Amino acid sequence: IALAAAGLSDSLFGKRLLPIGTIYDPFVCRGLDALNYACYQDARFMIVGTPSGVTLAPEGGAHQSISTPLIGLSQDGIMSFEPAFVDELSIIMSWGLSFMQQDDGGSIYLRLTTRPLEQPKRQLTDNLKNDVVNGAYWWREPGPNCELIIAYQGVVADQVFSAAGYLAEAK
């Protein structure tokens, strides 16, 4: 509710604030009415949910945020992202803070992890930045003999890379 109230500052006081808040992602549904109404009122905020996905599986089913991606995908007025790497997060946050200020912009929902991942060392080209914001990019472009493409998002990146290596060796 506080994010929604601060996110309405432009329509109430003529000055836009850029509030950023955190939430325990598995329990985002507990504040879903406030999130929905905030988006319907064109409130602008960035909400960060951690930990995303099933990274807390040992703690039981209530601690797995399996359905929360659907909230970000289906709620009008909010853009949802689940980056795997910090360079992606940097690109998304920079874009998101700009998007929140645009007349036709909206809010941002980031689903992040607390699980450590090895970070890539790569050149962030303009094309890569655009692809990150648009939701997908090739980690490795498929060659002419490609038989399988594995798509992923978020914290499972290292597991996907391991699976791809295993499949390549098994072939």
Regions flagged by a language model, labelled:
Residues 2-149:
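Conserved thiamine diphosphate
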Residues 152-171:
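Redox- and metal-dependent alpha/beta enzyme cores, enriched for Fe-S-associated oxidoreductases
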